[in-house]
């Protein structure tokens, strides 16, 4: 597979992952709306708060994922996608296949 084909494959995976994260976020918004619309018994308040906390954590994680994916796509446009941001050496293809939005090689991933 040529480098250009490989980059195209990674780009498709990044966009697909971003779409999945957006879909998860949409589900979180719907769940939050359902929680706010229904009158609940006082005993259920703690459960509702726990669910809201989980949704907030998901929102943070989703935002981080989207930002990482967008950074990877931007690095791709700049021709820097497969280079480690720390040392400038190439990021292992196996690592990119596992985590296509990564910006560091496996050596520097262990130090972060």
Residue positions per predicted region:
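Interaction interfaces in information-processing and related assembly proteins
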Residues: 1-78
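Flexible coil/turn residues that form the inter-helical turn or adjacent wing/linker of helix-turn-helix
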Residues: 80, 89
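Residues immediately within or flanking Cys/His clusters that coordinate Zn2+
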Residues: 81, 102
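Short, cysteine/histidine-rich loop/knuckle motifs that typically chelate Zn2+
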Residues: 86-87, 107
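A short beta-strand motif that forms part of the nucleic acid-binding face
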Residues: 88, 100
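Short functional micro-motifs and their immediate structural scaffolds
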Residues: 91-92, 110
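Short Cys/His-rich "knuckle" micro-motifs
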Residues: 94-99
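Short microdomains enriched in Cys/His and/or Lys/Arg
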Residues: 103-112
């Amino acid at each position: 597979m040529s480098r250009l084909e490989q980059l195209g494959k990674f780009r498709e995976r990044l966009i697909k992952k971003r779409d999945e994260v957006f879909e998860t976020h949409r589900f979180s918004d719907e769940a939050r709306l359902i929680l706010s619309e229904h009158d609940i018994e006082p005993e259920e308040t703690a459960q509702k708060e726990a669910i809201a906390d989980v949704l907030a954590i998901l929102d943070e994680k989703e935002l981080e994922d989207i930002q990482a994916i967008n950074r990877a796509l931007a690095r791709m446009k700049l021709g820097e996608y497969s280079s480690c941001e720390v040392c400038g050496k190439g990021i292992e293809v196996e690592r990119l296949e596992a985590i296509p939005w990564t910006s560091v090689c496996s050596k520097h991933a262990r130090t972060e």
